[in-house]
């Protein structure tokens, strides 16, 4: 829809459903930030997210019915699937902890995916097309869908880590607890170096940070749990991809650009989990590692695809 032809949009229900989901998320976005400033989660935001997820579900089912194959074979379909997975992950996380910070952190990701798919991609990349012979395999659903869901979980978890950094900004908070955020010993370090456990009588500037401690710990725990799920799914996705590659091309690993960046992504999040489980890190330092992972996923998924390089690329600049 590079030229944004309104007639072609209204005649194509798949594109129309995507735009409807975009409109709902766009409506929810300012509401998310208002809820953060108000300090309370909003049932209206969750309702809009739920409706957008239902619209994306209907869009994917309709494209599946139209094309006759699982709708994840081109960049438009994979972006819509990623938006669906991001909104679903966000809803599941908010069910665990209904905080406005979750919606404010994660909603822009789903919105950005749909916006890029609907307004930036050329028309030929938005249309359903027959699968190439190598993709006509039952591994398509197993490998690609698991990888995309892992990306969604890792993206949402990393965005929650960014929220940890934003919450702790300028307050020098350091969280000390178990890897799942329970039984925490939390301390604040003042500019002069004074340290106090939360809840213990201390200087006024330390007492004022108790709410931020609780918020940071919740965000940090949710980020850790979400990233753990995403990491496990990414591991399964990489292994299933290796098996599929061996069947299709006779090689378990070919150092294709997407494979290489997927490995880099796996190593970054493995380092994140290592720092938490083995080193006992929590709070800002692992959040910085997760933020690096956010950049790596964007390069792995969008950067490689748009350059049209390798067997995994959907193409754009060089072969569109």
Curated annotation (Swiss-Prot):
Where it sits in the cell: the answer is: Cellular thylakoid membrane
For this UniProt entry, what's an example GO CC term? plasma membrane-derived thylakoid membrane
Q: Give TM segment ranges.
A: 14-34, 68-88, 101-121, 146-166, 226-246, 260-277, 289-309
| Domain of life of the source | Bacteria
Q: How does it sit in the membrane?
A: Multi-pass membrane protein
- Listed GO biological process terms: cytochrome complex assembly
An example of a GO molecular function for this protein is: heme transmembrane transporter activity
Work out whether the entry's keyword set contains Transmembrane helix. Answer: yes
Q: Which InterPro entries match?
A: Cyt_c_assembly (IPR002541), Cyt_c_biogenesis_CcmC (IPR003557), Cyt_c_biogenesis_CcsA (IPR017562), Cyt_c_biogenesis_CcsA/CcmC (IPR045062)
User: Which Pfam families does UniProt cross-reference here?
Assistant: Cytochrom_C_asm
Matches recorded under PANTHER family:
CYTOCHROME B_B6 PROTEIN-RELATED, HEME EXPORTER PROTEIN C
Q: Name the family.
A: Belongs to the CcmF/CycK/Ccl1/NrfE/CcsA family.
Q: How does it assemble?
A: May interact with ccs1.
What name does this protein carry? Answer: Cytochrome c biogenesis protein CcsA
Q: Which organism is it from?
A: Synechococcus sp. (strain WH7803)
Organism placement in taxonomy: Bacteria, Bacillati, Cyanobacteriota, Cyanophyceae, Synechococcales
């Amino acid at each position: 829809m590079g030229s944004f032809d309104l007639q072609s949009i209204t005649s194509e229900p798949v594109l129309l459903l995507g735009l409807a989901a975009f409109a709902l998320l766009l409506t929810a976005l300012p509401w998310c930030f208002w809820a953060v400033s108000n300090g309370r989660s909003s049932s209206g935001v969750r309702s809009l997210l739920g409706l957008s997820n239902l619209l994306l579900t209907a869009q994917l089912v309709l494209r599946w019915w139209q094309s006759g194959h699982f709708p994840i074979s081109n960049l438009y379909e994979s972006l819509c699937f990623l938006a669906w997975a991001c909104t679903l992950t966000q809803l599941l996380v908010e069910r665990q902890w209904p905080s406005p910070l979750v919606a404010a952190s994660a909603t822009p990701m789903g919105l950005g995916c749909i916006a890029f798919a609907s307004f930036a991609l050329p028309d030929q990349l938005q249309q359903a097309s027959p699968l190439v012979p190598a993709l006509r395999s039952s591994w398509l659903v197993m490998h690609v869908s698991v990888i995309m869901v892992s990306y969604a979980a890792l993206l949402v978890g990393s965005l929650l880590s960014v929220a940890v950094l934003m919450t702790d900004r300028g307050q020098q908070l350091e969280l000390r607890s178990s890897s799942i955020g329970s039984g925490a010993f939390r301390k604040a370090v003042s500019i002069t170096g004074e340290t106090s456990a939360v809840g213990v009588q201390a200087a006024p500037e330390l007492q004022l940070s108790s709410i931020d401690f609780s918020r940071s710990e919740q965000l940090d725990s949710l980020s850790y749990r979400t990233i753990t799920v995403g990491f496990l799914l990414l591991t399964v996705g990489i292994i299933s991809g290796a098996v599929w590659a061996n069947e299709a091309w006779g090689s378990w690993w070919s150092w294709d650009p997407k494979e290489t960046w997927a490995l880099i992504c796996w190593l970054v999040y493995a380092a994140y989990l290592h720092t938490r489980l083995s080193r006992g890190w929590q709070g800002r330092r692992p959040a910085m590692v997760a933020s690096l992972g956010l950049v790596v996923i964007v390069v792995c998924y969008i950067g490689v695809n748009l350059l049209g390089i390798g067997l995994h690329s959907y193409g754009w600049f060089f072969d569109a």
